[in-house]
């Protein structure tokens, strides 16, 4: 155990936040540079290992399987967003959406769609990768804030990630606490649904108050061509709902968008290739952040930082309620460092289970709490996969905003955390017969 191993995370936070406040614009502070500064501090502060060994640890963290899969999703999401836009699918989607959905409900509607898809498929990253390109299509034409649209998508994705029976976080939370998924679902619904309803209302109000300049008038008539050009979006959503791997989903969507773009004139063969290539390059900053964050976490973990954090929180627990609060903070802090809620639950879960047995805390409550803590932090950290995918897709569509700019529009995770605290402090969660076992 080594508390000093956590210093690089403090270096990252101080560097990024301080310069962002000084500049009054977080987008002016490259997050990649902040991570490089933090990694440099980790390499020079660590003791007991040769510098070459630390570099190897850094490389292993950057090359982690989960990080590589995340990067592949970033690349494909960038290609799909760029090709779909160039093919004319964006304008067609906007024209058809305005026929079926009032403009004032567009943001709230995307929150609902994202929630339902994530609940069905159990993956927030896959949901955001599938829905974000569609959401960005509505920003300019309807005069809506792209950050608000992205925030609604991320919020909905985290709702499903927390509740879905097939979500990695649900599986990890229930297995580490030894409880049934159904019991955990019931406990979580009591907290998640009220938070989601408040978020829906906020997005409805926020979407109704948008006063941007529309580039596609409300009276634009839909044509047969519009129905054809939106097929890539339809295909991506349907395949995502069917549970197909997100890599295959995005590949098929990109190919179909390119074929339709060539067939209906906006693109030719070489133009489609060039557009796809540019879309992938637009994700370069997102890819770099993912790689660097993976390497930094590996350095900190190997130096004993995560182990010390677990010990420090566990020794503060004195009873059932403090056990529940400790479970929330332990999972949340580990997630803050790992930038992966499933990994955070797997790391914190066994410790939480032992504390629960010792202080007779309800394991069903604990399973719900650690899942909520993971989803809360994962939905608001600007270097997490969900925020990175959303900002990357937005950048591919021509919209620039910082991760913090997006987080300020991601309301649901904050509401979910507040709901969880209320549940803990007021003991409003259903009492499980397994408590104290």
Question: Which sequence ranges carry the predicted segments?
Answer:
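Juxtamembrane and boundary regions of transmembrane helices in multi-pass small-molecule transporters
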Residues: 26, 155-158, 162-221, 379-380, ...
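Core transmembrane alpha-helical segments of multi-pass membrane transporters/permeases
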Residues: 32, 44, 55-88, 104, ...
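Hydrophobic alpha-helical transmembrane segments of multi-pass integral membrane proteins
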Residues: 71-80, 101-134, 314-354, 358-359, ...
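Alpha-helical transmembrane segments of multi-pass membrane proteins
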Residues: 104-117, 143-160, 322-335, 359-380, ...
């Amino acid at each position: 155990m080594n508390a000093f191993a956590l210093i690089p995370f403090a270096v990252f936070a101080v560097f990024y936040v301080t310069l962002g406040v000084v500049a009054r614009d977080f987008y002016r502070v490259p997050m990649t540079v902040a991570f490089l500064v933090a990694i440099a501090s980790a390499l020079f502060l660590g003791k007991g290992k040769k510098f070459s060994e630390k570099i190897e640890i850094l490389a292993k963290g950057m090359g982690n399987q989960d990080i590589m899969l995340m990067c592949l999703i970033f690349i494909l999401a960038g290609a799909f967003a760029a090709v779909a836009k160039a093919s004319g699918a964006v304008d067609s989607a906007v024209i058809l959406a305005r026929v079926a959905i009032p403009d004032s409900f567009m943001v709230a509607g995307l929150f609902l769609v994202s929630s339902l898809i994530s609940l069905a498929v159990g993956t927030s990253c896959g949901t955001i990768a599938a829905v974000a390109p569609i959401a960005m299509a509505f920003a300019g034409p309807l005069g809506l804030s792209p950050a608000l649209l992205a925030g609604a998508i991320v919020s909905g994705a985290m709702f499903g990630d927390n509740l879905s029976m097939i979500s990695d976080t649900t599986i990890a939370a229930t297995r580490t606490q030894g409880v049934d998924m159904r019991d955990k679902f019931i406990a979580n619904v009591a907290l998640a649904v009220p938070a989601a309803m408040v978020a829906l209302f906020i997005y409805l109000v926020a979407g109704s108050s948008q006063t941007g300049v529309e580039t596609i008038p409300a009276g634009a008539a839909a044509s047969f061509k519009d129905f054809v050009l939106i097929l890539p979006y339809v295909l991506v959503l349907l395949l995502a709902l069917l549970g197909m791997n997100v890599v295959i989903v995005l590949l098929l969507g990109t190919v179909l968008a390119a074929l339709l773009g060539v067939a209906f004139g906006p693109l030719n063969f070489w133009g489609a290739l060039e557009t796809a290539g540019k879309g992938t390059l637009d994700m370069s900053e997102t890819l770099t952040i993912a790689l660097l964050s993976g390497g930094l976490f590996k350095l900190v973990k190997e130096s004993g930082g995560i182990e010390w954090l677990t010990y420090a929180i566990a020794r503060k627990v004195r009873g059932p309620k403090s056990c529940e609060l400790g479970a929330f903070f332990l999972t949340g802090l580990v997630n803050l460092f790992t930038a992966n809620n499933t990994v955070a639950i797997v790391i914190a879960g066994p410790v939480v289970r032992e504390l629960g047995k010792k202080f007779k805390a309800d394991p069903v409550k604990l399973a719900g709490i650690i899942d909520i803590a993971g989803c809360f932090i994962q939905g608001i950290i600007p270097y997490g996969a969900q925020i990175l995918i959303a900002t990357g897709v937005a950048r591919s569509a021509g919209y620039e905003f910082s991760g913090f700019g997006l987080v300020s529009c991601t309301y649901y995770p904050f509401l979910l955390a507040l709901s969880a605290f209320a549940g803990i402090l007021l003991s409003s969660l259903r009492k499980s017969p397994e408590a104290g076992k």
